[in-house]
């Protein structure tokens, strides 16, 4: 059965017209779903009983099931169960009047970065559009209790967004549009390890969302050690695609850089990063590595983190240090899989 959360409004209009219904019924249906959070068509009282019954028979209105919620201050991690029994994790960060949702796009991840917990799962499957949108529905329902709304969406959860391109792009359109979640492009960020052909394709979509590149090293030798796909998509070509995206969209690109002790946090690493990015439409987001016990790495010392940041800032690079919200509940960068394995009965 088709899940209605996978459809854009024009697709629903076409289906309704085939049923002999006026196209404005689609607007009413989506108002119930995205504005009133009503997922039972029988409760859509401005529709005829016949149409309500037809919607119930033709579409699924299912969203992921909440298995467990863990909280740490302003961060909540949701373990969700999909219809086939697979699990994903979604994170809500509430900070300074913002509610940012970090969505997953795959069950597991195919990239296998050598510092990230999600990659240890491997790839189970891609998420469908409705499974991405369903994560937002779950969290918006939770926020409604406080009369709050989702303000930002980041594609930084489990999986590589550009490896599930079609479903991710469709979900972005649903999030952006007024009939959907009505969240503006500048409040949507897609983070990618750097699948270069898809970055060029994304630039042509005219979505104008924010792009974040998971760089994590300033030269190919180091990056290839922790990001296997770098051998296929080396740094120089990756930067070229990123700056093409910036030129096409008018948005500077964020480069995420996880700091790992005595690996990529040295003075020379910072200076090499300056040479790559100086004078470019770039912003660097430094992220202290969050411990994953299967890997031998350690988090950089604070003095080295601040030295790295200072070298970039003094060289004219826009740089911020990300506070790792949620690391205590394993909801921080690179940690999404602990609840997944626990729910599957595996050792973590």
From Swiss-Prot:
Keywords: 4Fe-4S, Cytoplasm, Disulfide bond, Iron, Iron-sulfur, Metal-binding, Methyltransferase, rRNA processing, S-adenosyl-L-methionine, Transferase, tRNA processing. Binds 1 [4Fe-4S] cluster. The cluster is coordinated with 3 cysteines and an exchangeable S-adenosyl-L-methionine. One of its GO terms (cellular component) is cytoplasm. One of its GO terms (molecular function) is rRNA binding. Its EC number is 2.1.1.192. It holds the Pfam family Radical_SAM. Its cofactor is [4Fe-4S] cluster. It is an enzyme of class 2 (transferase). CDD domains: Radical_SAM (cd01335). The active site is at residues 89, 333. It is found in: Cytoplasm. It comes from the Bacteria. It catalyses: adenosine(2503) in 23S rRNA + 2 reduced [2Fe-2S]-[ferredoxin] + 2 S-adenosyl-L-methionine = 2-methyladenosine(2503) in 23S rRNA + 5'-deoxyadenosine + L-methionine + 2 oxidized [2Fe-2S]-[ferredoxin] + S-adenosyl-L-homocysteine; adenosine(37) in tRNA + 2 reduced [2Fe-2S]-[ferredoxin] + 2 S-adenosyl-L-methionine = 2-methyladenosine(37) in tRNA + 5'-deoxyadenosine + L-methionine + 2 oxidized [2Fe-2S]-[ferredoxin] + S-adenosyl-L-homocysteine. InterPro entries: Aldolase_TIM, Methyltransferase_A, RlmN_N, RNA_MTrfase_RlmN, rRNA_lsu_MTrfase_RlmN/Cfr, rSAM. Disulfide bonds join 102-333. [4Fe-4S] cluster binds at residues 109, 113, 116. One of its GO terms (biological process) is rRNA base methylation. Residues 95-328 form the Radical SAM core domain. S-adenosyl-L-methionine binds at residues 159-160, 191, 214-216, 290. Transmembrane segments: none annotated. Reaction proceeds by a ping-pong mechanism involving intermediate methylation of a conserved cysteine residue. Belongs to the radical SAM superfamily. RlmN family. Specifically methylates position 2 of adenine 2503 in 23S rRNA and position 2 of adenine 37 in tRNAs. This is Probable dual-specificity RNA methyltransferase RlmN. The lineage of its organism: Bacteria, Pseudomonadati, Dictyoglomota, Dictyoglomia, Dictyoglomales.
């Amino acid at each position: 059965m088709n899940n209605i959360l996978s459809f854009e409004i024009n697709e629903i209009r076409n289906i309704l017209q085939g049923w002999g219904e006026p196209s404005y019924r689609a607007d009413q249906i989506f108002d119930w779903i995205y504005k009133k959070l009503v997922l039972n068509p029988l409760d859509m009282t401005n529709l005829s009983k016949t149409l309500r019954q037809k919607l119930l028979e033709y579409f699924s209105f299912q969203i992921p099931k909440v298995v467990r919620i863990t909280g740490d201050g302003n961060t909540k991690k949701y373990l969700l169960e999909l219809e086939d029994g697979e699990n994903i994790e979604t994170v809500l960060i509430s900070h300074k009047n913002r509610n940012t949702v970090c969505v997953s796009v795959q069950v597991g991840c195919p990239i296998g970065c050598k510092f990230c917990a999600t990659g240890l799962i491997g790839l189970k499957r891609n998420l469908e559009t409705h499974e991405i949108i369903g994560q937002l529905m779950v969290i918006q329902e939770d926020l409604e209790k406080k009369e709050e709304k989702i303000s930002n969406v980041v594609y930084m959860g489990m999986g590589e967004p550009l490896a599930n391109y079609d479903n991710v792009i469709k979900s972005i359109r649903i999030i952006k549009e007024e009939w959907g979640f009505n969240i503006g492009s500048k409040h949507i960020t897609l983070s990618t390890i750097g699948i270069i052909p898809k970055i060029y394709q994304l630039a042509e979509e005219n979505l104008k969302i924010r792009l974040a590149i998971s760089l994590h090293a300033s030269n190919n030798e180091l990056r290839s050690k922790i990001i296997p796909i770098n051998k296929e998509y080396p740094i120089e070509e990756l930067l070229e695609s990123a700056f093409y995206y910036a030129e096409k969209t008018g948005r500077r690109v964020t480069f995420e850089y996880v700091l790992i002790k005595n690996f990529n946090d040295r003075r020379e690493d910072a200076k090499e990063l300056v040479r790559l990015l100086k004078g470019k439409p770039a912003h660097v987001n430094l992220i202290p590595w969050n411990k994953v016990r299967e890997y031998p790495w350690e988090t950089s010392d604070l003095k080295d983190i601040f030295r790295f940041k200072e070298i970039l800032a003094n060289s004219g690079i826009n740089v911020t240090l990300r506070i790792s919200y949620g690391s205590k509940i394993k909801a921080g960068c690179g940690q999404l899989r602990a609840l997944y394995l626990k729910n599957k009965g595996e050792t973590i």
